[in-house]
Amino acid sequence: MIGRLTGNLVVKQAPNLMVDINGVGYDLLAPMSTFYQLPELDAKVVLHTHFAVSETSQQLFGFIDQQDREFFRMLIKVNGVGPKMAVGIMSMETNDIVRCILEDNLNALVKVPGVGKKTAERLIIEMRDKLKSWQVTPSVDATGSLVALDSAAPSQNAIVAEAESALVALGYKPVEASKAVARVTSDEITRSEDLIRLALRNMIPA
């Protein structure tokens, strides 16, 4: 069982990333809560991991901290929620997901790609009691430091393209992704992660 990886971040294209450890590249899927806090490429990264095995595949999932991983594991215990759907659900801020569940907010939950009314209802029923004592930890990046901007800012077109690609990978239609990104695009935004976060908040108001 692989519980944690420490290495250099060599691929960062939501929801996929790769960590190089002594010349071996580990492919992982990660929720947006992790991508928001990743360092720049080639920097050292520490990720807590979950190894999911099914009849047809084996997949590593990476998380900034153990609390994110714990929340992911809570999600996949819900009837009908698999690991990839859990990653999609965690495109919402953890605080927002918890609040939606505790407040029975079906309307927000069903806006997540792949989550229908029945799945949203199961999330609320099966997780509500478990989340009543949930504590959210302060945001830090994957090196253990406070979140900081990348030193080399990509072009605005590249940021927009990366944000749209990430939303499509999360299950949104290309037209939906393009419109959502266009609504929140600003010259002041210098990271695709920030643009994705704003677009998701606009698409899934909690």
Curated annotation (Swiss-Prot):
Region forming the signal peptide: none
Region (Domain III): 155-206
InterPro entries, per database record: DNA_helicase_Holl-junc_RuvA_I (IPR013849), Hlx-hairpin-Hlx_DNA-bd_motif (IPR003583), NA-bd_OB-fold (IPR012340), RuvA (IPR000085), RuvA_2-like (IPR010994), RuvA_C (IPR011114), RuvA_C_sf (IPR036267)
Annotated region (Flexible linker), positions in chain: 143-154
Cellular component, GO, one term: Holliday junction resolvase complex
Region Domain I, annotated ranges: 1-64
Biological process, per Gene Ontology: DNA recombination; DNA repair
Keywords for this protein: Cytoplasm, DNA damage, DNA recombination, DNA repair, DNA-binding
Localization of this protein: Cytoplasm
Family statement drawn from the similarity comment of this UniProt entry: Belongs to the RuvA family.
UniProt remark on domains: Has three domains with a flexible linker between the domains II and III and assumes an 'L' shape. Domain III is highly mobile and contacts RuvB.
Xref: HAMAP family: DNA_HJ_migration_RuvA (MF_00031)
Biological function: The RuvA-RuvB-RuvC complex processes Holliday junction (HJ) DNA during genetic recombination and DNA repair, while the RuvA-RuvB complex plays an important role in the rescue of blocked DNA replication forks via replication fork reversal (RFR). RuvA specifically binds to HJ cruciform DNA, conferring on it an open structure. The RuvB hexamer acts as an ATP-dependent pump, pulling dsDNA into and through the RuvAB complex. HJ branch migration allows RuvC to scan DNA until it finds its consensus sequence, where it cleaves and resolves the cruciform DNA.
Protein name, per record: Holliday junction branch migration complex subunit RuvA
